[in-house]
């Protein structure tokens, strides 16, 4: 499939310099390739475009294994592959759901490309659920994270399973890790697009909190943002829950995101935030890596990042591509901005408005209890909502169709009407659940 046609499908006008360089190097050279480029520069597409060209679409064999450090990146990368419209079959494998369910799905899909976490991939290969003999391309995305303590042994076991590898592609947003010998990348081409200077498109501010508990200051700060898309970063799961509860009680549309949530809860939180149903995502540093959500205007460091690397990945969520962004440090007495934060830092004083109300997002998220396995498509959902709930097409936003359920963004002001009109109705002859996702 031509690159221009894929870009049209993705709504991208042209590749950036890093993506063009990666595409040409991976396709035209036999060497292994290491791509170093900041967060938010499109590394997923940088390797998927050439991979799609190198895979034999006429063969049912598994030919490409993409290793990622977490389930969110596995799911998002597989979604990009699907949206490219290359016709290649792909699947994401990750922990948090039964291996047997994935095994059944693998037999149905017969993927040519698999995205997965190291432990789950090892499990499938060890049980013979996937064949290693025809795998010719190994991709390790965020290889610095994959090779950290706890992943290293699993990675070494995994890499040793592929006897016929022709190419290794490693990608990272940092240059902190040496590539271990077991990866066996002997003749490698390194594309280094890391920039030492801080991103000039991110403006950095400090916000003084008079109280040690910063929640009141956070409220005033978020009120000043109106309905701008914002991620608030904290260092601990219980702090995320407490902060999200406070903001919800104060009328903000909030999603909470951390590793203590189950997979479906995490998916719902991300869908609400990415489709515009929640203006604020309150997250641990789990949300600083691998999430590809465009148009995030503000990053708020409620807690100071524990490491420079965490800081780099946090601010990488904003100012993506050619857009601008803002980062805010909320500081109580005795707290200081770390020395590694470079660039001009301005004071920001949000207006005190105790009676002000948060802006409400235009959209809300609707949950549908059926999905791909029930032959439900985006077109079916749009047609059903326009006919049964009397919505206009402009009232319907992003639709995400999963195997067994769907998320649909609809006009928030019409959500009650939708729930009333769809109650007891069948879609494609199937009775199902329709309900609003509120967190």
Go through each PLM region and give its residues.
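Conserved segment of the helicase C-terminal RecA-like domain
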Residues: 280, 307-311, 315-348
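Conserved nucleic-acid-binding Ia/Ib motif block in the N-terminal RecA-like helicase ATPase lobe
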Residues: 2-5, 59-126, 134-137, 242-257, ...
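Walker A/P-loop NTP-binding motif
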Residues: 20-29, 44-59, 80-84
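A short beta-strand element within the Helicase C-terminal
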Residues: 134, 289-304, 326-330
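Conserved pre-motif I regulatory segment
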Residues: 1-36
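Non-catalytic terminal extensions of ATP-dependent helicases
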Residues: 351-439
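Conserved interdomain hinge at the start of the Helicase C-terminal
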Residues: 201-246
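Post-DEXD/H (motif II) to motif III coupling segment of the RecA-like Helicase ATP-binding lobe
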Residues: 130-196, 341-342
